[in-house]
Amino acid sequence: MEPTVHRLINGDSRDLSFLSDGSVHLVVTSPPYWNLKRYNENPDQIGHIQDYEAFLLELEKVWRHVYRILVPGGRLVCVVGDVCVARRDFGRHLVFPLHADICVICRRIGFDNLNPIIWHKIANASYEVENGSKFLGKPYEP
């Protein structure tokens, strides 16, 4: 068996031009959760975008590159959750369906969407909730 070659590239996933068309079998990613967390101080970080629709447009650039580089039958695995925003930010409690919006964008690009896998993750609850909310900062019950 031939040895495999691995490269780790630190860059912007909105530009994957260094990868050839149809050269990747699997992409696993967890995009930023819109503006809920400061990931770093890089001004180009898409997690810093305040407008949700503008954020989705930037994510679409990523998905278009991913679609181009995947082999026929290749897979994109996207670990993402919906985004709950507090009343203090929008005057009312809102849930932005990030997972559904990504599915719609990817389907328009040409991806075949499979059923989502729901992960009931509560391990980070102590970081997300200060007032003991039973919903743990998530749009669904634990």
Can you name each region flagged by the protein language model?
Residues M1-P142:
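Core catalytic lobe of class I
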